[in-house]
């Protein structure tokens, strides 16, 4: 496990299953319709129970680069922040991923929450390269934590060893 300090906040790397983390919020790599399908979203749907998808349906969707918050249902995390990352090839992907990351952190602050875990957004079926993902997301988090925030801890939770190693090289 690797950790760095930015101002008054910690950024940590963890390898494992994001749905097993006991935090204020975990981030779901969502689609713009907020339908919990496969990947991280599927794991959240299976372990969190139907209430999360029901809340997503009530919200109705959000834009690429946007984020919305729901309850954590039966998960260990209190909330799920559904961040919509870009699909590779749609254009302006780096900025959209940065926005999804920043909008997730803003929601955390707005709800006076202190801890959050991100997966590698858009690197699954959306086809975004893991090395670019690590650069964009880590820089966005560092930039946000350098400002005025109450966030105490940001975790990047990577499912595979290879993804963890890519983020490990980038986090310095």
Set out the residue ranges of the language-model regions.
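Phosphate/ribose-phosphate-bearing ligand recognition and processing surfaces
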Residues: 88-172
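Glycine-/small-residue-enriched capping loops at alpha/beta junctions
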Residues: 1-111
